[in-house]
């Protein structure tokens, strides 16, 4: 198998117990190189406790949101407040950070899925702990829910690249670019363009949408069926083995043999 570039966002949160993407790729015998596309900074929210004290639900769509909550609240969820999360990784983060079990875990690891499902579950004031800039998926799904408030607890700051390092890269050795977030895809658009027809592996629908909006043609995007690091590795392995993979389309996800 060839070599892959994967995007990475640096953060200082402590709730990562699962293997890293690099470890999972190495386990499959895949050579990879990291490109840092951002750095997580946590936001100190004014009157944070006041903002959440009347909430019936706290909603988290990432481990960074859990860490941002802990940065403001000291790992203590107010008594009587229920917690909803996206997927198992965020569920594990809440368990590790706050010592509690989430009351609701989405069936799919996307903000869109969580938002759609919560419309039939929640009542009262819902506090959505999120990034300063979000994909908008959960908000779109809960557009008709009038008592949803957004509380940004972290931001994803871009970083400067070492242009010389990437200018000297032997692009002929690269078999794919693995993109772990929509913002990362936007930030390395220049590298995706430079690598021309190399496939771009996307972690999920929101990421694929951002790639398309940035001008990446749909034929280049391979979307992970499971929107996790494991799912990304499976997508890469399937493509390398010429097995069926998920190809992103504007309206549907179809399976093709490539």
Predicted regions and their residues:
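Signature of uroporphyrinogen-III synthase
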Residues: 1-258
């Amino acid at each position: 198998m060839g070599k892959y570039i994967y995007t990475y966002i640096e953060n200082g949160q402590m709730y990562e117990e699962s293997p890293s993407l690099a470890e999972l790729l190495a386990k499959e015998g895949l050579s990879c190189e990291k490109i840092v596309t951002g750095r997580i900074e946590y936001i100190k929210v004014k009157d944070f406790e006041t903002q959440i004290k009347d909430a019936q639900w706290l909603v988290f769509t990432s481990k960074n949101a859990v860490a941002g909550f802990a940065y403001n609240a000291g790992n203590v969820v107010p008594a009587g407040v229920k917690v909803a999360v996206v997927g198992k990784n965020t569920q594990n983060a809440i368990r590790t950070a706050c010592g509690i079990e989430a009351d609701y875990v989405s069936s799919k690891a996307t903000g869109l899925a969580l938002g759609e499902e919560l419309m039939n579950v929640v009542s009262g004031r819902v506090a959505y702990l999120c990034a300063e800039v979000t994909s908008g998926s959960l908000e779109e799904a809960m557009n008709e829910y009038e008592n949803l408030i957004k509380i940004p607890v972290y931001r994803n700051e871009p970083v400067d690249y070492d242009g010389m390092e990437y200018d000297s890269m032997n692009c002929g050795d690269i078999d794919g670019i693995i993109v772990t977030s929509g913002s990362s895809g936007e930030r390395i658009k220049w590298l995706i363009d430079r690598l021309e027809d190399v496939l771009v592996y996307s972690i999920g629908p929101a990421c694929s949408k951002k790639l398309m909006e940035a001008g990446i043609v749909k034929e280049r995007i391979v979307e992970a069926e499971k929107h996790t690091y494991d799912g990304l590795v499976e997508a890469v392995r399937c493509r390398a083995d010429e097995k069926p993979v998920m190809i992103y389309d504007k309206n549907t996800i179809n399976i093709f043999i490539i």
